[in-house]
Amino acid sequence: MNRLEVTEKIISTKVTKGIKWEAVAKKVGLSKEWVTAACLGQMTLNAEQAKIVGKMFGLTVEEQKWLQVAPYKGSLPTLVPTDPLIYRWYEIVNVYGSTIKELIHEEFGDGIMSAIDFSMDIVRQPDPKGDRVNVVLSGKFLPYKQY
């Protein structure tokens, strides 16, 4: 048993039972974005959260324990993602990454945007030309220190 197997079981059960991430998030009491990341193996659940997720997805006690282990975050199976939607994000960073970096540095100074003190919100934005995906990323600015 390992974390990847637990993630695969969660995805399989989600499909067969028609479970929505929003429903899981409501039961856990956190955002759909964070809970989805946790269920996909990218975040760590506490014991209570793992028990709730375990009940929804029919996980054993051992499988629930795996949800409480700190994962290897950002561990995609290939260097360049092949899934079209994930690849678009890769492409966005390749095209706009230097622009984002320049504008953040111009506004805040030399530093980084945290992915630890971080939140995101994904919503559908109706548009007569075709609905749009509205993604808001919010990370704390962390300046580099001098020493």
Swiss-Prot record:
Reactions that this protein is recorded to catalyse: cyanate + hydrogencarbonate + 3 H(+) = NH4(+) + 2 CO2
InterPro entries assigned: Cyanase, Cyanate_lyase_C, Cyanate_lyase_C_sf, CYNS_N, Lambda_DNA-bd_dom_sf
Residues at the catalytic site: R88, E91, S114
CDD domains xref list: Cyanase_C
BP terms from Gene Ontology: cyanate metabolic process
GO molecular function: cyanate hydratase activity; DNA binding
Keywords on record: Lyase
Entry EC number(s): 4.2.1.104
First-tier enzyme category under EC: lyase
UniProt KW Manganese keyword: no
Protein family according to the UniProt entry: Belongs to the cyanase family.
Role this protein plays: Catalyzes the reaction of cyanate with bicarbonate to produce ammonia and carbon dioxide.
The protein, known as: Cyanate hydratase
Originating species: Albidiferax ferrireducens (strain ATCC BAA-621 / DSM 15236 / T118) (Rhodoferax ferrireducens)
Gene designation: cynS
